[in-house]
Each structure stands twice: as structure tokens, then as C-alpha cells.
Design a protein with these regions (language model features):
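Conserved SAM-binding motif I beta-strand of class I
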Residues: 204-209
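S-adenosyl-L-methionine
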Residues: 211-259
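Non-catalytic substrate-recognition/targeting regions of SAM-dependent transferases
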Residues: 64-77, 93-164, 172
């Protein structure tokens, strides 16, 4: 990028669209393997600093978080010996091979596989002809560890890079609240919150997702950690219908801990209004069904939904349900999903832990 007087401004990846340039550097430097090695080395140092890399009970973390690590358009998650790399821009897709070489150089023998997973994240997919696949190795080992709990990672068909690593800290917090409670995990996907609740001492855990594949994966992950444990049951049902039916049948369970972690209701600003209606409706149903003294963990992962937007939707839901509610915790993404101070939009995950009278 140059000024009208041909003075240097920045170097970045160009593509046609709403974001035409993703800036990689404001220094006049070459974007080559050495450039990526330096950025990746700094990113790794950050993860060592915050204590998520090289832990015996945790081999899962985000190494690169796009703009937060000064590598816009690139996400890299580490699952034990496998790095899952995802491009969100054409330029980063074109650089995928030198990024992979840089990653091998920086990580040395701590990774043996690099899986490239960008089919669903790239624009102009037809023109690029992109297919997911290994850039290094080819291991089919799919079990990773987070805070001592094991789970399967579906590199090929799973959402994002295969697991929602951004909820690690929030899952740990949920574990502390689970002892003796009857837990409902809505939009469970891989069941992460469910098996943390089980380890925390929950007396019953129900996992709900509209996708049968998600239910199968949840059951597999629960079995991996708690084989033959009768406390868990999973249901392939619509979330709103499931909430409506709570307490409708004699002897059916009620819940005193509910997790609401839906997929993004809005991916662009035009969808914001309907998204906020969705969050209000969802939370209202949870407020209406939870038992007195219950706890709700509620989240939004929509970047266009601000903290104030989300809080207002939740507060409106509480008022409509006629429940008295206290905020116990305000939640966000973990430290391995850093936010560049010049890119506040990187703060996408927001959540609340609520006590409901």
C-alpha cells in the first residue's frame, strides 16, 4: 500500500470484498518464510508465557489467533502432535505452504502433522478448488487432552478446527459449580461442558444438540472419560422445543444448572436485530425453566453482537420471565485468543454466569 505520493504505508494480502486488505506489516519487509517464522515464534512465546504450551495435562491450545497475533486471516490450533491450520483469506491460502514450513521450523519435533482445513472459511472456494488435507504427516490419531480430560477431534468434518478451544477456561469454571447439580448442556456439540460437569460431581447431565453427529461425538467423548457412567444422557432435539418440554411430563427432570452456548446467531450486521431477538427468546426460556437457586452459563460468539447488546438481551429475557437474577461472572475468550488493541473486533466471545432466584 502506497500514498498518492508513492510513499510506503503497509504490506498486506489483497482480495475483493468488504475487507480488501489485511495488513501484515507496517514495515517495508518481504513476506516470506522468515517473516512467518518470526511471527510464529512470538506467538509461541506468548503461549509459553501464559502457560498453555508444554503442560502435561493439556496439549490443546490456539497458537495463532489472526489479528490478535498480527497474522490476519490465519488460525492455528494445536492438538497434541497435530497443528490444524485454517486460512480466512485468499492471500493466506496462497501462502499456506511457506506458513507450514515456518511452523515446522518453529515447533521442531513438537508437531508431526499439519492439517489444512479451509474449505468452509475461504471466499471464492470454487475458483480456488480448495480441499482439506494434510500438509505434513497424516496421522489419524484424534484424541487430545484439555485440563486432564480427553476428547476426540474431527479434523475433517468438525466445526472450526475440530473443537472449541476458546471455552477452555469457562469449562473449568463450570466444573466448580457442578457438584450435586442437575445439568443441562444446550447446543452441546462435542460435549465439552458435559464431561467437565461430570468431573465436577454433577448428579445428572443431559446434553442436547439438533445434530445427531454432535450427539454421537458427545457420547464418544463422555465414554472416553467416564465409561459406563449412568449420569449422562444425550438428546438429538431442537433446543427451543427441548426447553419448552421441561417439566411437562410427570417425573421428568428439572435443572439447576443450564449452559446456553449456541452457534453464532449473527455473522454480519444485517442479522443483528434478529440475532438479539433469538438470544432474548432462548434466555427467557431458560429463565422460565431453571429451578430457584439455579445457575445459568450463557454465551454469544457473534462478533457483531457487542457486550452491551448481549447483556441487554439477557436482562430483557430475565424481566420477561419475571426472575430475579445476579451476575456472578462476566466471561470472555481465553488468553491464547489475544485481542490486538488496534482490532477490538477480535473480542468476539462474551458470556455471563447468572444466579437465578
Amino acid at each position: 500500500m502506497l500514498t498518492a505520493d508513492k510513499e510506503y504505508i503497509a504490506t498486506g494480502h489483497f482480495q475483493i470484498g468488504s475487507i480488501m486488505v489485511r495488513v501484515l506489516s507496517f514495515d517495508n519487509e518481504t513476506i516470506d518464510q522468515k517473516f512467518y517464522e518470526h511471527r510464529l515464534a512470538v506467538a509461541l512465546d506468548v503461549r509459553r508465557c501464559i502457560g498453555v504450551a508444554n503442560r502435561t495435562n493439556n496439549n490443546t491450545y490456539r497458537l495463532v489467533h489472526g489479528e490478535g497475533d498480527n497474522l490476519p486471516g490465519l488460525v492455528i490450533d494445536i492438538y497434541d502432535k497435530t497443528a490444524v491450520m485454517q486460512a480466512h483469506s485468499v492471500g493466506m491460502h496462497m501462502d499456506r505452504n511457506i506458513v507450514a514450513e515456518a511452523l515446522k521450523s518453529v515447533m521442531h519435533d513438537s508437531i508431526e502433522n499439519i492439517f489444512y482445513k479451509s474449505e468452509t472459511t475461504l471466499p471464492f472456494k470454487a475458483e480456488l478448488g480448495q480441499e482439506n488435507g494434510f500438509l505434513l504427516g497424516g496421522s489419524k490419531e484424534d484424541v487430545a487432552i484439555e485440563n486432564g480430560l480427553k476428547y476426540h477431534v474431527d479434523w475433517l468434518r468438525g466445526q472450526k478446527t475440530g473443537f472449541f478451544v476458546d471455552q477452555r477456561d469457562n469449562r473449568s469454571l463450570l466444573e466448580r459449580y457442578s457438584n450435586g447439580r442437575t445439568v443441562l448442556n444446550m447446543f452441546c456439540y462435542t460435549g465439552g461442558f458435559s464431561f467437565y460437569a461430570m468431573r465436577g460431581g454433577a448428579k445428572l447431565v443431559h446434553s442436547v444438540d439438533s445434530s445427531q453427529k454432535a450427539i454421537d461425538l458427545t457420547n464418544a467423548n463422555v465414554k472416553l472419560n467416564f465409561p459406563d457412567d449412568p449420569r449422562h444422557e444425550a438428546f438429538a432435539e431442537d433446543a427451543f422445543k427441548f426447553l419448552d418440554n421441561i417439566g411437562q411430563q410427570p417425573g421428568s427432570p428439572t435443572y439447576d444448572l443450564i449452559i446456553l452456548d449456541p452457534p453464532a446467531f449473527a455473522k454480519h450486521k444485517d442479522a443483528l436485530r434478529n440475532a438479539l431477538k433469538g438470544y432474548t427468546r432462548l434466555n427467557q426460556k431458560a429463565f422460565e425453566k431453571i429451578t430457584p437457586g439455579g445457575i445459568i452459563f450463557t454465551f454469544s460468539c457473534s462478533q457483531v453482537v457487542t457486550k452491551d447488546n448481549f447483556r441487554n438481551a439477557v436482562f430483557t429475557a430475565a424481566a420477561m420471565a419475571g426472575r430475579k437474577v445476579r451476575i456472578l461472572h462476566q466471561l470472555h475468550q481465553p488468553a491464547d485468543h489475544p485481542i490486538n488493541i488496534y482490532h477490538p473486533e477480535g473480542e468476539y466471545l462474551k458470556g455471563l454466569v447468572l444466579y437465578v432466584e
